[in-house]
Amino acid sequence: MDWRDQGILLTVRRHGESSALIEVFTEDHGLHAGLVRGGASRKMAPHLQPGAQLDLTWSARLEDHLGTYKAEPLRSRAGMALSGRLALAGLNAVCALLAFALPDRAPYPALYHRSSALLDLLDSEDLWPLAYLRWELSLLEDLGYGLDLSACAATGVTQDLRYVSPKTGRAVSGAAAGEWADRLLPLPPVMRGEGAAEDIEILTALRTTGFFLESKLAPALGNRPIPEARGRFLDALARRV
């Protein structure tokens, strides 16, 4: 059997003398691995870089086999990734998180398009941090761990929302938090699409989303550690503050 699709290259590993084992996030087939014969050759290897947009034809005798890919480059993002430390760290974080979090062969077309659009902003460093935060929030949402920041979980008010409950992922107002405030996670305005989206606020927001990646998503995936590439991206962003 075979199919054709577009995909974002997430990981690539040499296999044997000249082949490459790749993982791609495709529009219609989700996270899908396969072997590219000649993928480690001088001709093909430069096109098989993480973040690359590929036209893919997958073939296998049976659906549950690893299968092989024919991969044609559509768009390289290597140049954008090399435009600065933040861009490279961001690309690595996105690819690593997708490879970590996505179930095999389950389509997430909306997340695929958001991921592709995010990577196309790699060389726009002023836009990238906020776009990344929105993407990470959508990643949690699509995988079943979305945050409800619309109103206070305790009172229903929509004003003065300052915290997120680590148990429920719901917003909590300053008044409702009371003496429990130090046990809650910060909810900077940028997480609700408000405020000036300064880097320091985005960093705070990413520490909150990171809590849910570690405490909710990771346990569902066998308690594997969150990819270090995400931490390196936060470090690169912190250097700008």
Curated annotation (Swiss-Prot):
Keywords: DNA damage, DNA recombination, DNA repair. One of its GO terms (biological process) is DNA recombination. Belongs to the RecO family. The keyword DNA damage applies. GO terms for cellular component: bacterial nucleoid. Transmembrane segments: none annotated. Involved in DNA repair and RecF pathway recombination. InterPro entries: ARFGAP/RecO, DNA_rep/recomb_RecO_N, NA-bd_OB-fold, RecO, RecO_C. Pfam families: RecO_C (PF02565), RecO_N (PF11967). This is DNA repair protein RecO. HAMAP family: RecO. PANTHER family: DNA REPAIR PROTEIN RECO.
